[in-house]
From Swiss-Prot:
Binds 1 zinc ion per subunit. It comes from Nitratidesulfovibrio vulgaris (strain ATCC 29579 / DSM 644 / CCUG 34227 / NCIMB 8303 / VKM B-1760 / Hildenborough). The gene is hisD. Gene3D superfamilies: 1.20.5.1300, Nitrogenase molybdenum iron protein domain. This is Histidinol dehydrogenase. Catalyzes the sequential NAD-dependent oxidations of L-histidinol to L-histidinaldehyde and then to L-histidine. Keywords: Amino-acid biosynthesis, Histidine biosynthesis, Metal-binding, NAD, Oxidoreductase, Zinc. Zn(2+) binds at Q264, H267, D366, H425. It catalyses: L-histidinol + 2 NAD(+) + H2O = L-histidine + 2 NADH + 3 H(+). Pfam families: Histidinol_dh. CDD domains: Histidinol_dh. Its cofactor is Zn(2+). It comes from the Bacteria. GO terms for cellular component: cytosol. Substrate binds at S242, Q264, H267, H333, D366, E420, H425.
């Protein structure tokens, strides 16, 4: 049996599943001291520290001179990528851009009768640093993550975007990654990975300018580094391992449910794939399908461990309990494979993204549909949202008071200030009252 099967009669039995998942949230305390040393080294030594770490972990012959990718390298990479792949990347980028254009916020102003103008000014940050994992040996870079991070920044109006990705052992970056950057018009690309890339973004080096926002996925070293520099710079989120929860009734196809569960389980041994269903027969059929599909899956070892440790098939008496369990989990990806998925959508309050209906598999959203795939994990969808255009914007309040407004409210403001013991505040407000 690839994963445990649980039967929950009510939401009150949630701990049977919640306790199982709790272990995924435990931090690795051994990582933080290592990352702290990396941050300090890059802050002190800059490019040389980046080169030292890259020599140690990625490319044995790396030097500071290789940090920045040249335009000639990008041109060669683009020429080497099949035209069909270029077309697919362009289409995905167009879909993502179209969706995020709808997210754009605009500055707004309200004028009062006395002439006072109040408003909110929306401004993009100046610089963004985007991290793109290189994948296995640098040969499976997360192209989709580059698109999902860069396009919202561009739509927001960020004019300076730097991309960092670890090089392959020969010092090159994957041509498809460089082609994707070229399609997006990004020219500032550095060869650096892990926590030292995050450090370069946060502190800057001799040749890399510090940024205002750091975004992009990564392993525990990247995530820990982002957490430790947060406050000096903004970050997109603290993301954990991938996860999916599927709500399914008798109309769901077992082979599709199993395929969707495995789409997340193959990511990482810590990934979580959960089916919640009202149908015991579906639970049994999906379990059998998981075994059948695992037999031919290239990353079966990873998927098996993820399912064994963090996967579950949960049988519940009705969809009310199923929805309650889903809201408790607050998963990164929530698929609804039921006869009437839209009827449940309003009750599903906590999820990074909702995938409604049998033709909305999670990978469609991950790669191509348009909504962002950088999503809250580990239950944080209870209070946080997907990466968006807003990740790269800030909002500034505007107060342009008229003389009449200032004079009319001077005494009230002064009184509030004195209640807080702030006499200088009170005098500042009162000084605008010409009646005194």
């Amino acid at each position: 049996m690839p994963c445990r099967i649980l039967t929950l009669q009510s939401e009150a039995q949630w701990p049977l599943l919640g306790d199982m998942l709790a272990g995924r949230y435990d931090p690795d305390d051994a990582v933080e001291p290592v990352v702290r040393d990396i941050l300090a080294a890059v802050r002190s030594k800059g490019d040389e520290a980046l080169a030292e770490y890259t020599r140690r972990f990625d490319c044995p012959d790396f030097t500071p001179a290789l940090l920045h990718v040249t335009s000639e390298e990008v041109a060669q990479a683009v020429a080497s990528v099949p035209a069909d792949d270029i077309a697919i990347i362009r289409q995905a980028a167009d879909n993502i851009r179209s969706f995020h254009e709808a997210q754009k916020e605009r500055s707004w102003f309200v004028t009062h009768d006395d002439g006072t103008i109040l408003g909110q000014k929306v401004t993009p940050v100046d610089r963004a640093g985007l991290y793109v994992p290189g994948g296995k040996g640098g040969d499976t870079p997360l192209l989709s993550s580059l698109l999902m991070n860069a396009i919202p920044a561009q739509v927001a109006g960020v004019t300076s975007i730097t991309v960092a990705s670890p090089p392959r052992p020969d010092g090159t970056l994957n041509p498809h990654l460089l082609a994707a950057a070229h399609i997006l018009g990004i020219t500032d690309i550095i060869r650096a990975g892990s926590a030292w890339a995050v450090a370069a973004f946060a502190f800057g080096t001799q040749t890399i300018a510090p940024v205002d926002v750091i975004a992009g996925p990564g392993n525990i070293f990247v995530t820990t580094a982002k957490r430790m520099v947060q406050g000096r710079v903004a970050i997109d989120m603290i993301a954990g391992p991938s996860e999916i929860l599927i709500l399914a009734d008798a109309t769901a196809r077992p082979d599709w449910v199993a395929a969707d569960m495995l789409s997340q389980a193959e990511h990482d041994p810590l990934a979580s794939s959960i089916l919640v269903t009202t149908e015991p027969a579906l639970a049994e059929a999906v379990t059998a399908e998981l075994e059948r599909q695992l037999a031919t899956l290239p990353r079966a070892d990873i998927a098996r461990k993820a399912l064994a440790d963090w996967g579950a098939v949960v049988v519940v008496p009705d969809m009310d309990v199923a929805v309650a369990i889903a809201n408790r989990v607050a998963p990164e990806h929530l698929e609804v494979l039921t006869a009437q998925p839209w009827e449940l959508a309003g009750s599903l309050r906590h999820a990074g993204a909702l995938f409604l209906g049998p033709y909305s598999p999670e990978p469609l959203g991950d790669y191509f549909a348009g909504p962002n795939h950088v999503l809250p994990t580990m239950g944080t969808a209870r209070f946080s949202s997907a990466l968006s255009v807003q990740t790269f914007c800030k909002r500034t309040s505007i107060i342009a008071a008229s003389r009449a407004f200032a004079e009319r409210n001077a005494d009230a403001v002064a009184r509030l200030a004195r209640l807080e013991g702030l006499e200088a505040h009170a005098r500042s407000a009162a000084s605008r009252n010409s009646q005194q």
